[in-house]
Amino acid sequence: MYEKRERYMEDAFHKISRSIVDFLTENQIGNLVVGYNKDWKQNINIGKSNNQKFVQMPFARLRSYLKYKCEMSGIRFICNEESYTSKCDALAYEPVDKHETYLGKRVKRGLFRSSVGKLINADVNGAVNILRKVVGDSEIASRVIDRGLLLSPIR
């Protein structure tokens, strides 16, 4: 049973990583930034059965597949530490580090209320903050936030 699961996971991770790299190549995207948190699976509590399934998923393997496929395709792979990225307000350019109080807040699962009065997906807020840690605020402002792509995504 263990070998079957291993083969299943390896196949799935190869397919997922290939589809991501193909998307990046087709859209002429030259960098892939992936967030990483060292202890992110240690204190998880999503129910006994889900905990067992989730903690066993080898996300480090997915990152390694992404890295080597990006390198083969000429895409720069960046793995960046992601602490405090989901709590800080990306739209208000709040510094991404530990604070006593944060400008925005998560109003319910999956929804983040920015201090500028906008509602955005909480995962999008975290992803923008991970990217801000890598490229800086000025790059994010000119390419994403000020153009409205964050609040009105192109479909």
Which stretches of residues belong to each language-model region?
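Substrate-contacting helices/loops that form the catalytic groove of nucleic-acid
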Residues: M1-A60, I140-R155
